[in-house]
Amino acid sequence: MQRKITIIASAAVAVAAIAAGVIFATGALTLTQQNNVNDEGNNINNTAQTTEQDGNDKLEVIASFFPLYDFARHVGGDRAQVSSLIPVGIEPHDWEPTAQNIVALQNADMFIFNGAGFEGEWITQIETNLKVDTSTGIQLLEGGEDEAHQEEPLGQEDTAAVTTDPHIWLDPVLAKHQVEVIRDAFIQLDLENSSYYRDNAARYISELESIDASIKSELLSSDCNLKDFIAFHDAFSYFANRYNLTQHSVQGISPEGGEILPQRIIQIRDLATQLGIDTIYSEDLVDPRLATVVANEIPNGRVLTLSPIEGVDKEELDQGIGYIQKMRENIDNLKVGLKCQ
């Protein structure tokens, strides 16, 4: 199915003990990314993270990273071979494709990407049969803007240009929009099976609506004592905006960017103490030790995971864990941090 179509659719902190990965350099605290992915997992874009089918009549679909892969495989079902461009266990910010990736994209029937600047400039140079930008039609937030529910990343000087916040998939309502865009793209390529894609999308959207209802009932009730939480990086603005919560973050839009100043750790500690926060959220694809350092400075402090759902590890992939399950884990961990009874 190779017709050329392009759509834009839809304090003092003791850190010496962890010098192996958390290093003071010229007065700044720098984290190294956690790299515990095995070689087998790194081949995920062509093997492990591909839906299982062998027929030549299947649509060849590539999604830029995990949540879009998960959305697309639920919509495409057994009529599509869906793979993820970014390998398993890899933090996708600032990732760039290899020559092999580009060839695969050129041969695909459909390339689904997040948009809103998430994939970087390379996305504009990709030529493929059908490019699907899932951010089209969404009112985007700008990184660093508070929208009444986002605090500037703690201790970060306002020296960088404001950037678009790409983390739309973390709002289940906007994720529903992305699924609808993907559904329409499948129908555009395979009109004969439109009812199949509509039915698959409807089932998955029902699951997203259930997650939305769970968040409202479990996190927004009077049983929750807090409305503020501290995420590791600035990924939850859309989520916080949707559910009337306030996100504070240790780092900015990208979890890999910049140095972490010692005084910033003190700021986080002081803010947490002021607001009664005892939970610092780490992430599943970055080194958790900084969050542990901060949590150790807070009375009764602890570290839990708040996943930006940018990827899964190989074990989770093998277990069939997807967006819905990761969001459910986030709800459970937020209930602890927000002190919900």
Model-derived segments and spans:
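Extracytoplasmic metal-acquisition and chelation regions
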Residues: 2-341
